[in-house]
Structures are given as C-alpha cells and as structure tokens.
Amino acid sequence: MKLEMICTGEEVLSGQILDTNAAWFANVMMDMGVETQYRVTVGDRLEDLVAVFRERSLHADVILVNGGLGPTSDDMSAQAMAMAKGEPLVENALWRHTLEEWFARYNREMPRSNLKQAMLPASAIMVDNPVGTACGFRVKLNNAWLFFTPGVPSELKHMVHEQFIPFIRSEYELDEQSSVEKLLTLGQGESAIGDILSEVLLPEGISFGYRSFMPYIEVKIFARGQKAMAQLGSITSQVKHALGAVVVAEGKTSLAAEIHARLFQSGFSLSVAESCTGGMIASQLTDFPGSSSYFQQGLVTYSNESKVKLLGVLPQTLDDHGAVSIATVEAMAIGARNILDSDFALATSGIAGPDGGTEDKPVGTVAIALATKFGTYSQMVKLPRRSRELVRNLTAAIALDMLRRALLDEAVIVDYPSVQRLAK
C-alpha cells in the first residue's frame, strides 16, 4: 500500500501554525510499519486543491487529507473533492441530523454556516466524528482512496485510530510483522550518533531512523519480519552500549515523561527552584496527569532578591560567587528541598542569552544542582549558544537527567559530548 498525505490550510502553508498533525500521523503509521511516502501542503485555493487531488490520486493507494472541513469560506476540501471528481455536493442527511442534535443538546441554535459541514461529494462515504462538528469522508478517485479528516488535532487523532486504521486494515494487506524500539538521547549531535551506529552490523530487516527535536535526538530501531523482530532486543542492547551515557530514556518522548513515570511509581517527592529555565522544568512535569502525587512546588527565583528571600541563599554567597555559580545553585536546591522536606530538589541558574554574558561567564554558562537527603550534586557547564531556547531546553533536560540517574542509583553527573564541563 502506497500511503500519502495532503495537508491543507493557508496558515499551515505560511508557517503561522506548526503542522504537528503531519508529524504525528507519519509517526503513528511508521510504528505500524507503514511508511508515508509523500506529503504535500496546499493553501486555501480551490484550483490548487483540485489539481493536487487529481494528480496525487494517480500515484497513491491511500491519501489522508487533513483540514478544510470547517464551516467558513476558506474550508474548501469537500468542494474541491467534488470538483476533482466532476460531481456535485449533496447534503448528507445523517450528518445534518447529527449537527442539529449536537446544537440542541447545548440549547444553542445551529448557525446556517454549519450546514456546509453536511455537504459532501455525491459519491462520498461519510466518516463519523463523535468529538467535533466536522464529519470526515472518503472518496475513490483514479487509483486512490482519499480519506478526509478534520484539522483539529484531537479530532484527527480520534478519527485515525477509530476509523482510518481499521479502514486500511480492511482494504489492504499490511505487513504488520514489524516492531520499533525508540531510544531518546541527549548531548550528542545526529551526525555523531549516525557515525557511531554505522559500526553496528545490522541483520536483514533491521534499520535505523533518526528524529531531531530540541534538545533530543530520537533513535528508532525498526524491525520488519519475524526473524528481524526476534533480533530486535539484541540489536537494541548493542545500540545502547555503543551510545553509552547519552541514552536517557527508552520508549519515551522526553525526559520529563521518564521522570514522571519513575516519580509517580516511587512515591518520592520533588521541588524545583528555577532561574534561567523560568519554570520550564515545573511546566514539563505538571503537564502529566497525576504529577500532584510527587510534585510539591516550583519556584521561579529570577532575581537575586528572590533567591535570598524565598530560598535562603546568603547575600554573601551571591556577592562572592555570583548568581551563576556552583555555590549559589547548591544553596537554591537545598533551600527548595528544605521548604517542604522534599526527597529531591532541582535548581538551575544560567545565562541563556543572547546578552548578559561576560568573559568569565559567557552566554551558555549554566549551573545545575540536585539536592537529596544524602547530599547535593552540582555541575557548571558551557552549552552551545545557538539560541536562548536551546540553552534553556538543554539546561532543563540535563537537570532532569541528573534526577533520573539519582533515581536509578547511577552516577548523577556524566559527560555529554556536546557539552563542555566547567566545574562540578
């Protein structure tokens, strides 16, 4: 089965909205062993949509079309599909009834514009959407089934799992004798990881894939076929050994996800005191339901005054060593832990840039500490200064990795190839 994707919307094409739907969909399909072989983004222009539907339907077996099913004038997917096939739009009575019931349930009068969402190409097969007002539909054109989905991420995900995947499984023989292992790495570039893994001898049916997303590189190990799947565990172990300390999680998309799972299960508590990361660590952890079971508090102590008043950092420490120093960040972590007697406390302080650096402490200089009941661990590092965002994201990730290693009773402080150590 040759799978393609067409993404629609002027805001997506112009970059005003980041197209996370396309990345999510391709990732879900890849995990099933189905590769998305072609993707194109089209703006809200009727003639362009018609042309791309006709052209791509000559090459693909299945095309997932995302977006353009709303009630406004720039939602043109249904109209363009009808024109591409040379047939009229007709009202789908079932979906009109569904819309009327939906608005009545909330004691609201249905705007006339929503009737547009019940107008489908004459040959279309309606696809239910129980979580939104835009139904999906599918149409056969030339060689391909075009499967139309809403642009709202939650609605797309529901429709893909509940409708699209069952459809392709029923229509095509998918080679689902496949599996994938995902390793999250930190502190080493993609090219360097690729060079290291080029030395790993891969049996037939096993391949590598890489995904870069700040500040991580995700290594995917794909196995296709029963024999390859049986060897996947052994190859994954070889990869972990080859990469060493830069592997920070397995089967997770972030260190925060790894820490959440471990703290949630362990019963340990955590406090956080952040300066340069500005609440980023607290935000990443509290994004997860259930984080209240372990996350006690997060303090953003950006100024020296707040470090003194809220965390008990001595003014003399700041005068002697500065805000970005081992002494200060250790005092921040100890102060945060003592407030509620947390099992662990993380603290960060640094110069994220683009300004504020000095000759002694240039932009990218960061101090990180982890306070525990058994002692305090700290390090001062120089991070790549490509952007303020990178410095802050990488600082948060290193802090979380220190905590992860403490939870696993491993060496808390390790060297990352792309990070320069200044002190510990």
Curated annotation (Swiss-Prot):
Classification via SUPFAM superfamilies: CinA-like (SSF142433), Molybdenum cofactor biosynthesis proteins (SSF53218)
Database matches in Pfam families: CinA, MoCF_biosynth
Segments traversing the membrane: none
Top-rank taxon: Bacteria
Homology family: Belongs to the CinA family.
Official protein name in the record: CinA-like protein
